Structure formats: structure tokens, C-alpha cells
């Protein structure tokens, strides 16, 4: 790599990520090439490989890093009315919004690319798994706050967060499998499951 400052390197890397995100969204993973990325970014194709080892790695960086950043922000919205189940659903669903704005085709490609990368580079699979664990941890902390605030009676928040995460994975899978299923159905189904899990623990309200 030519001797350029760290700041300039960061600019180039971010440009590659930005352009790649645009192309992946518009034409999909398979029809996007490192050549088309370099052309759109205004750089030599070889420059891309100074920052990423493959198109798969770019794809991972574009979508999973964005999702991780959203998870890192945590679940911070407070309960503002008596409809606690709806508020809990909204808060938990909120982290998923950025990912679900992607076309279903891109989301399916994310799964396929993840499996492909996991076989070649286990460290990327571990990174992906760490995002899921972080999400469950944030849900657990969120439930703990509601217990401390006397919105919910005591239960094992770690186990509950794992069950909720399993429900989320199932609903996302159904959303991707059912071509005509809208995001609103995913959210409503998640609301029903959260209601089933937590309605017996609500203190007052509904």
C-alpha cells in the first residue's frame, strides 16, 4: 500500500464500504464484483485488497458491522405507557430495524455468505456469534432494568433473553421464507410471543 496517512486509509476504506453497500443493495451480492466496486469508488481494483481479503469479507463488514453498531447502542427507550408488552416489543424490535430494511434477497445472501466465510475463516463466524451474544446480553440488561423498576416481577432474565432471541430468529426465518410476508407481520408475531412469555410477570397495567 502506498504510504498514506491513517486518516486517508480510513477514508478509502469507508468509501469502499459505502459503495459496496450501495451495490449490494441494488444488484445483490452475486452480481457485484470487486471490479464494479473499484470503478464506483474511483480506485484501482487492487487497492481493495489492501483493505479486504475478498468480496465476502467486504459483505460481512458492510452488514454485520452496521448491525453490531446498532446493537452496541443498546435498548434504552423507557416504558412511557401502561401497554408494557407493546413497548417491550418496540424496544426489542428497534435494534433489528436497520437489518430488516434490506431486501429479503440481500438478507438471504447474508446467511449464505456467513456460512461460506465460516468455513474459510472461523474468526469471522466467531465475530458474528459475538454479535448475537451481545444482542442477548442487551435484552437481558433491558429486562433487568424493568424488574428493578418494578414493571416486571422477578424471573431469570438470562434464560428469558435466550428464549426471546430464539423467537426472533424463528420469526426472521419465517419472514425470509414467506416471500409475501411483510415486516409488520414479523413484528406482530413477535409481539404475540413476547406477550405469551411476559404477561404473567407484568406488575399492574397490561
Write out the residue ranges for each language-model feature.
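Generic hydrophobic, amphipathic alpha-helix propensity
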Residues: 12-21, 37, 62-66, 70, ...
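Helix-turn-helix
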Residues: 15, 23-57, 61-62
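Solvent-exposed, amphipathic alpha-helical segments
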Residues: 15, 19-27, 74-77, 163, ...
Amino acid at each position: 500500500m502506498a504510504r498514506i496517512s491513517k486518516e486517508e486509509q480510513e477514508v478509502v476504506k469507508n468509501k469502499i464500504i459505502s459503495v459496496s453497500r450501495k451495490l449490494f443493495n441494488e444488484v445483490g451480492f452475486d452480481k457485484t464484483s470487486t471490479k464494479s466496486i473499484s470503478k464506483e469508488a474511483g480506485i484501482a481494483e487492487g487497492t481493495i485488497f489492501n483493505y479486504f481479503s475478498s468480496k465476502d469479507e467486504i459483505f460481512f463488514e458492510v452488514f454485520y458491522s452496521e448491525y453490531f453498531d446498532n446493537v452496541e447502542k443498546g435498548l434504552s427507550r423507557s416504558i412511557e405507557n401502561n401497554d408494557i408488552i407493546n413497548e417491550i416489543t418496540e424496544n426489542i424490535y428497534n435494534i433489528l430495524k436497520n437489518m430488516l430494511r434490506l431486501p429479503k434477497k440481500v438478507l438471504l445472501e447474508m446467511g449464505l455468505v456467513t456460512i461460506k466465510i465460516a468455513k474459510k475463516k472461523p474468526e469471522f463466524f466467531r465475530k458474528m456469534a459475538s454479535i448475537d451474544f451481545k444482542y442477548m446480553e442487551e435484552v437481558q440488561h433491558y429486562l433487568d432494568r424493568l424488574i428493578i423498576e418494578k414493571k416486571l416481577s422477578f424471573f431469570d432474565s438470562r434464560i428469558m433473553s435466550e428464549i426471546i432471541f430464539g423467537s426472533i430468529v424463528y420469526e426472521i426465518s419465517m419472514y425470509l421464507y414467506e416471500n409475501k410476508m411483510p415486516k409488520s407481520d414479523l413484528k406482530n408475531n413477535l409481539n404475540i410471543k413476547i406477550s405469551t412469555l411476559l404477561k404473567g410477570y407484568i406488575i399492574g397495567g397490561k
